[in-house]
Amino acid sequence: MAAQKDQQKDAEAEGLSGTTLLPKLIPSGAGREWLERRRATIRPWSTFVDQQRFSRPRNLGELCQRLVRNVEYYQSNYVFVFLGLILYCVVTSPMLLVALAVFFGACYILYLRTLESKLVLFGREVSPAHQYALAGGISFPFFWLAGAGSAVFWVLGATLVVIGSHAAFHQIEAVDGEELQMEPV
């Protein structure tokens, strides 16, 4: 029991929570709970990418039904596909990586300064929200030069194409308790 607590303390010291393996940078609260729910409801990747389950829908009604049901069923998987596309976009754009480093570096410096003492400019105490807005203002030219706007729209477009294609062409999972649909004769 003591060894298990020591391992958990070591993991927390490394920046990971022993129970969830989520980074400590994600504050506890609604964001962490949402991410934990997504991880808990993720569907098996083997069924998500099974090529034998892809087929062309017969008609528009089946296409719409597939879209709705697959987006609902694979919602957590689609969130991680979206996060993967964001990661791919950031890693393949060195200038965007530099802009993000400048922004997060400025935020980290401001965070360390607020731990030491309050920031005072022209005799007035500057709130943390204004400090982070200043960091964003300083980083804005870097984001503009890196083409962050086009990167955002690329990620959104790629996400819609990938998720829309998967949801439209992946056959619907059989759900327990689903009513049998009878065709009119």
Swiss-Prot record:
It is found in: Cell membrane; Cytoplasm; Golgi apparatus; Cytoplasmic vesicle, Secretory vesicle, Synaptic vesicle. The chain crosses the membrane at residues 79-94, 95-112, 132-148, 149-165. Ubiquitous. Strongest expression found in placenta, pituitary gland, kidney, lung and stomach. GO terms for cellular component: glutamatergic synapse; Golgi apparatus; membrane; plasma membrane; synaptic vesicle. Residues 165-185 are annotated as: Required for interaction with GDI1. It comes from the Eukaryota. Keywords: Cell membrane, Cytoplasm, Cytoplasmic vesicle, Golgi apparatus, Membrane, Synapse, Transmembrane, Transmembrane helix. Residues 1-78, 113-131, 166-185 are cytoplasmic. One of its GO terms (molecular function) is identical protein binding. Residues 175-185 are annotated as: Homodimerization. Residues 30-54, 175-185 are annotated as: Required for interaction with prenylated RAB3A and VAMP2. It is a multi-pass membrane protein. Belongs to the PRA1 family. General Rab protein regulator required for vesicle formation from the Golgi complex. May control vesicle docking and fusion by mediating the action of Rab GTPases to the SNARE complexes. In addition it inhibits the removal of Rab GTPases from the membrane by GDI. Homodimer. Interacts with VAMP2 (synaptobrevin-2), GDI1, and PCLO. Interacts specifically with prenylated Rab proteins; strongly with RAB4B, RAB5A and RAB5C, and weakly with RAB4A, RAB6, RAB7A, RAB17 and RAB22. Interacts with NDRG1. This is Prenylated Rab acceptor protein 1. It comes from Homo sapiens (Human). The gene is RABAC1.
